[in-house]
């Protein structure tokens, strides 16, 4: 006599188990659907075949790129996946946020992770703009809380010391936050001169990143109002 039991398991799996008694082996179940995986466990008189069906995980459609800072949008990592709270994992999760910060002339660095408290430093245009608190609270904090859950006790913003002197070396050092992204696009950036309100920069790369460079320099160095590119 054939007995069947269907059980629905929460998550992305469904299992259907069919059992039958037989003397000459076990029943053969044929299914042409590649989303089914068959597992057979033969016994002397009883055989069981379990069919696991993995529900399809819907992905975002190709096309316009949506910022993970937007409400209701999870990061590129699976939203169900959580991580141990370490500096390396915090940095990994923030990789989904950085492209959007960099496009606005900013970035974020992980300063420390201690006793559930994550200290971050916003860079470039994100540092002192009026929306910096919104960026931290509505964007970065939301993504981190989603990935680290109750292990994350607090997120603190660390601020840079006030810039006292504007030099070519100081501006170049500040642009280090953008150089990895520029290099990924096959570009380069170097500050050639700083004279009063004028800053001349040798830049090769995408126009969108170039606008971010200009914003990063002006936000950090308030006395610079003109940033000129040369190749």
Curated annotation (Swiss-Prot):
Subcellular location: Plastid, Chloroplast stroma
UniProt-listed Gene3D superfamilies: Fe-S cluster assembly (FSCA)
InterPro entries referenced in this protein's UniProt entry, alphabetically: FSCA_dom_sf, NIF_FeS_clus_asmbl_NifU_C
Superkingdom per UniProt: Eukaryota
UniProt keyword Transit peptide present: yes
Keyword set includes NAD: no
Entry-linked Pfam families: NifU
Entry keyword set: Chloroplast, Disulfide bond, Plastid, Transit peptide
Feature: transit peptide: 1-69
Annotated tissue distribution: Predominantly expressed in floral stalks and siliques. Expressed in leaves, cauline leaves, flower stalks and flowers (at protein level).
Annotated GO MF terms: iron ion binding; iron-sulfur cluster binding; structural molecule activity
GO cellular component: chloroplast; chloroplast stroma
Protein's GO biological process: iron-sulfur cluster assembly
Record-stated family: Belongs to the NifU family.
Subunit structure: Homodimer; disulfide-linked.
Function: Molecular scaffold for [Fe-S] cluster assembly of chloroplastic iron-sulfur proteins.
Protein name per its UniProtKB record: NifU-like protein 1, chloroplastic
Annotated organism of origin: Arabidopsis thaliana (Mouse-ear cress)
């Amino acid at each position: 006599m054939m007995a069947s039991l269907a059980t629905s398991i929460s998550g992305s799996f469904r299992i259907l188990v069919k059992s039958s008694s037989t003397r000459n082996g076990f029943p053969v179940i044929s299914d042409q659907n590649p989303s089914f995986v068959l597992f057979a466990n033969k016994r002397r008189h009883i055989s069981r075949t379990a069919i696991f069906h993995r529900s399809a995980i819907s992905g975002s459609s190709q096309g316009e790129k949506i910022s993970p800072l937007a409400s209701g949008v999870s990061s590129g990592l699976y939203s169900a996946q959580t991580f141990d709270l370490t500096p390396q994992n915090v940095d990994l999760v923030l990789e989904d946020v950085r492209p959007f910060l960099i496009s606005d002339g900013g970035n974020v660095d992980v300063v420390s992770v201690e006793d559930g408290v994550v200290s971050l430093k916003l860079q470039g245009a994100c540092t002192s703009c009026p929306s910096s608190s919104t960026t931290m609270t509505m964007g970065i904090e939301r993504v981190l809380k989603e990935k680290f859950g109750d292990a994350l006790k607090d997120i603190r913003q660390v601020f840079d010391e006030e810039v006292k002197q504007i030099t070519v070396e100081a501006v170049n050092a500040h642009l280090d936050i953008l150089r990895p992204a520029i290099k990924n696009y096959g570009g380069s950036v170097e500050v050639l001169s700083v004279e009063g309100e004028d800053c001349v920069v040798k830049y090769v790369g995408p126009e969108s990143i170039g606008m971010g460079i200009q914003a990063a320099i002006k936000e950090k160095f308030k006395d610079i109002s003109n940033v000129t590119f040369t190749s």
